[in-house]
UniProtKB/Swiss-Prot annotation:
Pathway: Purine metabolism; IMP biosynthesis via de novo pathway; 5-amino-1-(5-phospho-D-ribosyl)imidazole-4-carboxamide from 5-amino-1-(5-phospho-D-ribosyl)imidazole-4-carboxylate: step 1/2. It holds the Pfam family SAICAR_synt. One of its GO terms (biological process) is cobalamin biosynthetic process. This is Phosphoribosylaminoimidazole-succinocarboxamide synthase. It catalyses: 5-amino-1-(5-phospho-D-ribosyl)imidazole-4-carboxylate + L-aspartate + ATP = (2S)-2-[5-amino-1-(5-phospho-beta-D-ribosyl)imidazole-4-carboxamido]succinate + ADP + phosphate + 2 H(+). It comes from Streptococcus pyogenes serotype M18 (strain MGAS8232).
Length: 234
């Protein structure tokens, strides 16, 4: 059925289209933290996330990364290939921050010699627990070969993103990716890439991401607008 709500998320809603292999993603003016325990409506946030993610995915597509992104169709909407999402959050860390610093008792801002890739099991009831490769296989999420691909592709994407953000004066601290299987069974990059799911610090160490909301550091949309304008100028 066309225009039927398929999935209602914290930051995005997904609808069917006339093409069974294409979905319409609508970005919402909502910010959440602690797995939705804190929720707030922020006017304009959805449009900013959509535009930032669209720009990033367009660049990734051109760089040869296979993604679900098709096109942006309005300020807060885009068309994507329909995928079966892999229930993993793939996190890459270039610099210590956030939960990593808390978990291991290290200060924020320490540059990691080699970027660290982590897996989190996408399960709201379990609060998305941190898991390792053996857990991933035990749960039957993906196999050894697919685990290796997810890690390798995430590292490749990191090198591209780090370079682009460095050109606009931003340091890519860490980020979360999601992948899915397309209609041919190929793993492709899905979800979004915006300051909602990455950490960006400017040259002065100022947060240019969702930590502005998490830590009450200022106006979130003002910060996201700056990121968008920098990316447009790239």
């Amino acid at each position: 059925m066309t225009n039927q709500l398929i999935y209602k998320g914290k930051a995005k809603d997904i609808y069917s289209t006339k093409d069974e292999n294409v979905i319409r993603t609508v970005y919402k003016d909502q910010a959440t933290m602690l797995n939705g325990a804190r929720k707030e409506t922020i006017d304009g946030k959805g449009a900013l996330n959509n535009q930032i993610s669209s720009l990033i995915f367009e660049k990734l597509n051109k760089a040869g990364v296979v993604t679900h992104y098709i096109e942006q169709i309005s300020k807060n909407e885009q068309l994507n290939k329909k995928v079966d999402i892999i229930p993993l959050e793939v996190v890459l860390r270039n610099v210590t921050a956030g939960s990593f610093s808390k978990r291991f008792g290290v200060e924020e801002g320490r540059v990691l010699e080699t970027p660290i890739v982590e897996f989190y099991y996408k399960n709201d009831d379990l609060n998305d627990p941190f898991i390792n490769d053996e857990h991933v296989k035990f749960l039957g999420i993906v196999n050894d070969e697919e685990i290796a691909y997810l890690k390798g592709e995430t590292r490749r994407i990191n090198e591209l993103l780090k370079g682009w953000f460095a050109q606009i004066g931003l340091n890519l601290i860490d980020f979360k990716l999601e992948f899915g299987f397309d209609q041919e069974g190929t793993i492709i990059l899905a979800d979004e890439f915006s300051p909602d799911n990455c950490r960006l610090w400017d040259k002065n160490g100022n947060h240019m991401d969702k930590d502005v909301f998490r830590r009450d550091l200022g106006n979130l949309t003002d910060v996201y607008q700056v990121v968008l304008e920098k990316l447009i100028a790239l």
